[in-house]
UniProtKB/Swiss-Prot annotation:
Source organism superkingdom: Bacteria
Protein name: Glutamate racemase
InterPro entries recorded: Asp/Glu/hydantoin_racemase, Asp/Glu_race, Asp/Glu_racemase_AS_1, Asp/Glu_racemase_AS_2, Glu_race
Family note: Belongs to the aspartate/glutamate racemases family.
Biological classification of the source: Bacteria, Thermotogati, Deinococcota, Deinococci, Thermales
Gene source species: Thermus thermophilus (strain ATCC BAA-163 / DSM 7039 / HB27)
GO BP field: cell wall organization; peptidoglycan biosynthetic process; regulation of cell shape
Binding, substrate: 12-13, 44-45, 76-77, 177-178
Biological role stated in the UniProt entry: Provides the (R)-glutamate required for cell wall biosynthesis.
EC number: 5.1.1.3
Pathway stated in the Swiss-Prot or TrEMBL entry: Cell wall biogenesis; peptidoglycan biosynthesis
Catalytic residues (UniProt): 75 (proton donor/acceptor), 176 (proton donor/acceptor)
């Protein structure tokens, strides 16, 4: 029997998954969280899917050893590479971010997708929604990880990637959890296009599932421990610039995974 008071594990290649963590905390204020950012190996998007799959299994195994009651793969690349196997083989509920965003896009006639090279090439999204256009945007994740989401260079890069988007595009799936931090630049290039991200929808799915399984924490204090494979203080500085209050952060060496 899983312990309702156990934490929820959330992981991403870096700070992108903080968008999902924020939505989870808003819906589940009593839950305790372990947020794992694989900052020593970010970005995932240009790496082979087999390598990303290995990373996802390493992190999921580590989180299980910390006693989590559920795992949220708050990374589109890792969700595309590993989610079906993780969900089938792990002993706790596992949630990804691909299907929730794809479901949100079904109400639009002409839908586009931007994501990492690995996510776009994986074909994960077309399993759930018809796409009129898709584009890999490999520089977007480094822009966010370097703290440049509101720098003029972000707008220049967005124009470079999005200039060939169809003029009649109705919705664009932000197929990477880093990309919501770039909504200002993306929206400036594609005014009038609905920008869809999966954070809120994923959080709702997690909340429904935990309630159905009797796993909601009745008396938690809503704390989050941040775990990173890179420099903890560099992570803290970046996360706090993104609006995340980091009360506790600890480095996890790759040898511990």
């Amino acid at each position: 029997m899983k312990d309702p008071k156990a934490p929820i594990g959330v992981f991403d290649s870096g700070v992108g998954g903080l968008t999902v963590l924020k939505a989870l905390r808003r819906l589940l204020p009593r839950e305790e969280f372990l947020y794992f950012g694989d900052t020593a190996r970010v970005p995932y998007g240009g790496k082979p899917l087999a390598m990303v799959r290995r990373f996802a299994w390493e992190i999921a195994g580590f989180l299980l050893r910390q006693g989590v009651k559920a795992i949220v793969v708050a990374c589109n690349t890792a969700s595309s590479a590993a989610l079906p196997d993780l969900a089938e083989d792990l002993s706790v509920p596992v949630f990804g971010v691909v299907e929730p965003a794809a479901r949100a896009a079904r109400g639009f006639r002409k839908v586009g997708l931007i994501g990492t090279q690995a996510t776009v090439e994986s074909g994960a999204y077309p399993r759930y929604v018809d796409l009129a256009w898709a584009k890999a945007c490999p520089l977007f994740v480094p822009l966010v990880e370097e703290g440049l989401w509101d720098d003029p260079v972000a707008l220049l890069v967005a124009r470079h990637y999005l200039e060939d988007a169809p003029k009649d595009l109705e919705a664009l799936i932000l197929g990477c959890t880093h990309y919501p931090f770039l909504k200002g630049a993306i929206g400036a290039v594609l005014p009038g296009v609905a920008l869809l991200d999966s954070a809120e929808l994923t959080a709702r799915e997690v909340a429904r599932a935990l309630e159905a399984e009797g796993l909601l924490n009745p008396e938690g204090r809503g704390r989050t421990l941040h775990l990173v494979t890179g420099d903890p203080e560099a992570y803290r500085a970046l996360a706090e610039r993104l609006g995340e209050r980091v009360e506790a952060v600890r480095r996890v060496s790759l040898e511990e995974l």
